[in-house]
């Protein structure tokens, strides 16, 4: 966060917000750095949110987030639902972005208690679902069944002149 406060965003094209704790990331950034990130993207730069980073990018009522991706996390009371290899399938737009995976029926990525997204109907940001979660993860924390499957796995959207990519899982760890 000190780097952001010291204008590191002026020297990069994209920022990656990794996994961890979306709430901690939100609090550590503080209001000024949150706005700096939003302004950075709006001016034409990019942002990638992975797991907790995707939580941070969401527009989830009563949750610490910076409203960048048009998604709402649901069932956050069971965010410790479990982890492992998760199945996903690419949508048509996702096949264009990930051409090396386009011919696969199903792909796998490490999932570790990431958000369960739905489009936030109150948000003006229009996001594109690039992939759909096919796994039903609910082995821990009394998480209900049939909550994760069929939900957005990768989403992308414009934000001002920039682009935002959100992943509920950990492609960097796969």
Report residues per predicted region.
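Aromatic-Pro/Gly-enriched surface loop or interdomain linker
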Residues: 1-13
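Alpha-helical scaffolding within the catalytic cores
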Residues: 2-5, 32, 149-153
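Loop/turn elements at helix/coil->beta-strand transitions in domains of secreted/extracellular proteins
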Residues: 11-13, 43-46, 162
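Short, basic, glycine/proline-bearing loop/turn elements
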Residues: 13-25, 139
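Structural motif
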Residues: 14-19, 49, 164-168
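Flexible loop residues that form catalytic
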Residues: 20, 71, 172
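A glycine-rich, often tryptophan-bearing local segment used as a flexible ligand/cofactor-contacting loop or short
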Residues: 23-102
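Catalytic beta-strand/loop cores that center a nucleophilic Ser/Cys/Thr
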Residues: 86-163, 168-172
């Amino acid at each position: 966060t000190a780097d952001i406060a010291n204008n590191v965003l002026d020297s990069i094209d994209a920022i990656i917000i990794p996994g961890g704790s979306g709430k901690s990331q939100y609090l550590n950034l503080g209001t000024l750095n949150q706005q700096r990130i939003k302004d950075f993207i709006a001016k034409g730069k990019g942002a990638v949110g992975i797991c907790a980073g995707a939580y941070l990018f969401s527009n989830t009522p009563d949750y610490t987030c910076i409203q960048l991706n048009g998604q709402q996390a649901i069932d956050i009371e069971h965010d410790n639902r479990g982890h492992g290899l998760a199945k996903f399938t690419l949508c048509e737009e996702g096949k264009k972005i990930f051409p090396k995976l386009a011919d696969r029926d199903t792909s796998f990525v490490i999932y570790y208690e990431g958000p369960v997204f739905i489009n936030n109907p109150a948000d003006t940001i229009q996001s594109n679902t690039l992939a759909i979660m096919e796994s039903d993860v609910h082995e821990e924390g009394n998480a209900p069944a049939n909550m994760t499957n069929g939900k957005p796995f990768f989403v992308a959207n414009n934000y001002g002149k920039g682009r935002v990519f959100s992943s509920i899982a950990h492609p960097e760890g796969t």
